[in-house]
Amino acid sequence: MEKMTRVSTINGRTMFCHLDAPANAISVCRDATQVVVAGRNIFKIYGLEEDGFVERLNLRVGRKPSLNFSCADVMWHQMEENLLATAATNGAVVTWNLSRPCRNKQEQLFTEHKRTVNKVCFHPTEVNMLLSGSQDGFMKCFDLRKKESVSTFSGQSESVRDVQFSMKDYFTFAASFENGNVQLWDIRRPDRYERMFTAHTGPVFCCDWHPEDRGWLATGGRDKMVKVWDMSTNRVKEIYCVQTFASVARVKWRPERRYHLATCSMMVDHNIYVWDVRRPFIPFATFEEHKDVTTGIVWRHQHDPYFLLSGSKDSTLYQHMFKDASRPVDRANPEGLCFGLFGDLAFAAKESLMSAPASAGDVGRKTYPGGDRRYPIFFFKKPDVTEQFAQVSSALSVFESEADSSAGMDWFINTAQSYLLSGKPFAELCEHNAHVAKSLNRPQESTTWTMLRIMFSEPANPSLSTNHNLNKSGNLPLVNSFSMKEMSGALNERNKENRQDNIHSLETNLNNNDENEETEGSEGQAEYLFVDDELDDDELYSMEHDNQPAEESEYLLPQEAFPLRHEIMDHPSAPEPLQEKQESPHVSGSEAESMCLTPMESFSLISVSQQLFSPHLPPKFFCPIVKEMLCYYAEQGDVQMAVSVLIVLGDRIRKEIDELMQEHWYMSYIDLLQRFELWNVSNEVIKLSTCGAIMCLNQASTTLHINCSNCKRPMSNKGWICDRCHQCASVCAVCHHVVKGLFVWCQGCSHGGHLEHVMEWLKQSKHCPAGCGHLCEYT
C-alpha cells in the first residue's frame, strides 16, 4: 500500500526547460520533487511541478569561479534529502548540504584523486558512505564523518568509468574500466577485487545493478553493446545482449519492469532508447526530443516507470512521459534484410510469406487456433500473446553474390590496401588515391581526391603568396609586368606533370639607384602591360622589340608618358594590393626628364615583384564544403572515404569536425578493417589518428587466457600452478622450468619452451626436445 500511495502522487506531462549551459549529469531527490543539474558551467536545482520546471537554487556562488563547481557527475542521496555529492573535473570530490543557512552550501572537500573524477555514488542504505571512481585508476571510499578516505581500491588497470553499489548486497560494488573489464569488490577487502571479467571490447562507460534481481548487472560500452550479466553463479554468465546504434554512455533499469532498461549515447545519436532485453534488435520505446548528445538520464521515482528525466549538451532539461514516446516496433518492417561481409544477401520473413500454398484450395482457408479440427473450438484455449510471439517461426533465404559481382566487397579491400595516407607530399597523396579510385571504377571518389588536391595544394612559388600588405602610403603598385613567353612555358610544364593548376608570373626584381630606378625583366618576343586592375582587355597594349646588341644606342623613354598615380583610397572592385609595407618610390625633378632602359634589360617598365592578386583562395575557404562532403560520405556508409580524407588533410580540416564525430568514423572504419582481417591497415589508421581515444587502441595491454596443459582447466591469475592438478603451466621442454617470458612452440606437436633454448636445441637436433618423436622446424 505504501508503494502504491507514493506512485499515485506523481503527476506530470512531457515538458522541458532551457539551461544556462550544457549539462553533464542529473540526479533526482528521494521524493521525486526536485532534480539537480550539473555541468562545467552549471550547478542548479529545479523543482518539478505540473506546470513545468522551476529554478529553486543556484549552487554556483562566489566572485571567483572555482573548478570545484565544474562537475562531471552529481548524485543526490536517496536517504538524506539535503545531501548531494559531485565529481569535479580537477579531481575533487565535494559534498553539499542544502540545509546550511549560508549561500555557500559546500560542506566537505576531498582532494585525494590526482585526475578527473568520473563517478560518485552513495551507499543505498549507509548514510555516511560515499564511493568515487577516477581517471587515475583508483576508487576511494569516504566516510562523511571524517576528512579523509577510509579505504582505497586499486584496480591495477586504466581509468575508472563508473562505480555502483549493489542494491541487494550490502558490501558489494561494481566498477567498470577503460580497458573493457568489470570488477566486483567487497568494501571490507580493499587489497583485492573479488571477481573480474572482460565485458566489452573497448571501454565500459557505465553499469547498473538491477533493482529486483539480485545478481543482474547491466553494462554498456563503446562497442555499441548493452550486456546483462548474471553474478549469482560461481561463473559470470552473459544472459542478454542488446545491439544499440552508437556507444553507450548511460544505462538505467526501468522501475517495475524486469526486462526494460534505458540507454543514451555519448556521440552521434541524440535519442534515448528503452529496450526490452528479450527483443534486443529494436527499441521498445524512443524519446527523440533532444537536439544534441544526451548526457544524463534518470527515472523520476524508483517505483514509477512512466516518467524519465534527461539532460543534454543542447542545454535543455526534459521530463519525458512514457505515453508520449514513439514506438519503433509499430513502424518496423517485419521482414529482415542484411548484407554480408562479401556482398551476400540474407532475407528473413514469416514462413507463410516465404512458402507458396500447397494447392489452390488452401488459399484463403482459415485454421482453428488449436490446429486440430477433430475437436470443437471451445476446447482450445486462446494462447497468450507472449507465447504467440515465442512460437512465430521465420524462413531465411541467402543469396550468394558472384565473384565478379558489383555487390562484392573487393573494392573495399583493394582500396584499403592501395590508398596512401602518409609518407608523401599532400598533392602526391591525393593524386595517387585518385588514380586508385579511378582504377577501381569509383569515379566520384576519384574526382573528390582531385578536387582536394586543387583546393588545398600550396602554390609552387611561395614568394607569390597572399601574405603581403599595403605600403605605408597606401598606394597601389604602378605597373605589373608579365612575360608571356615564360608563362606559356611554365603552363606547358605544369600540364605535363598535371600537379598544379595555378598560374605563376615571372618574379622581377626592383633595384633602387641614386639617380634613377631601373627594372630588369626577362627577354621575350612580346610583353603585355597593364596598369593595376582597372583596365579592360581592350586596353592592353603589346609592345614589340627586337633583341639588339648591347653596344647599340639606348632607348630614351619620356617620364611624362607615365604620370604619377594619385593615392587610391577605397575601391570596392579592386583586389587587395599585395605589396610589402614600404614607401612608394619617389621620382625627383631631375629624374622626371627621362628614363633610360637598355635592350639587354628588356622592355619591362616600372613594375613590382609581386602579383596584384593570388590565383589561390585560402584553404579555410573550402573547409565548410569539405566538412559537408565528409559527413555525406559517412551518412552513405562510406566511412573509408571519410577517414582517409580526414587523415590526409590532417590539421587542415580536423578542427572543423567534432572530435566525437571523428572518433565514431574511426571506430566504424577500424571495425570494418578488422572484420576483413586487414590488420596492418587497421594499425596504420590507428597510428595516424589524432583522436586520443583511437591512438590508445593499439597501446592497450593484451590478455591471453591459457589452460593447463595437463588437465585443460583454465589457469587462474594467481600464479603458474594449476589449482586442480598442481602442475606447472608453460614448462620449457628443454630446461623443464616455467616460461615467464617469450614462449615458442611447435604447431605440429604443441611442445615448446624458452625461445633461446629451443633455438639452440634445433641447431643440434631436428627431433622435438620433449621426446615425442616429431620433427620440429624453427623458421
Swiss-Prot record:
Q: Which pathway does this chain act in?
A: Protein modification; protein ubiquitination
Q: Where does Zn(2+) 1 bind?
A: 708, 711, 722, 725
Q: Which InterPro entries match?
A: WD40/YVTN_repeat-like_dom_sf, WD40_repeat_CS, WD40_repeat_dom_sf, WD40_rpt, WDR24
Q: Name one GO biological process term.
A: cellular response to amino acid starvation
Instruction: Give each disulfide bond as a residue pair.
Output: none
Reactions mediated catalytically: S-ubiquitinyl-[E2 ubiquitin-conjugating enzyme]-L-cysteine + [acceptor protein]-L-lysine = [E2 ubiquitin-conjugating enzyme]-L-cysteine + N(6)-ubiquitinyl-[acceptor protein]-L-lysine
- In the record for this protein, the WD repeats are positioned at 66-106, 112-152, 155-195, 199-239, 243-285, 289-332
Q: Which GO terms describe its cellular component?
A: cytosol; GATOR2 complex; lysosomal membrane; vacuolar membrane
Q: Which UniProt keywords apply?
A: Autophagy, Lysosome, Membrane, Metal-binding, Repeat, Transferase, Ubl conjugation pathway, WD repeat, Zinc, Zinc-finger
Documented activity regulation: The GATOR2 complex is negatively regulated by the upstream amino acid sensors CASTOR1 and SESN2, which sequester the GATOR2 complex in absence of amino acids. In the presence of abundant amino acids, GATOR2 is released from CASTOR1 and SESN2 and activated.
Annotated region Disordered: where?
A: 506-526, 570-590
Entry keyword Membrane: yes
Protein name from the UniProt record: GATOR2 complex protein WDR24
List the top taxonomic levels of the source: Eukaryota, Metazoa, Chordata, Craniata, Vertebrata
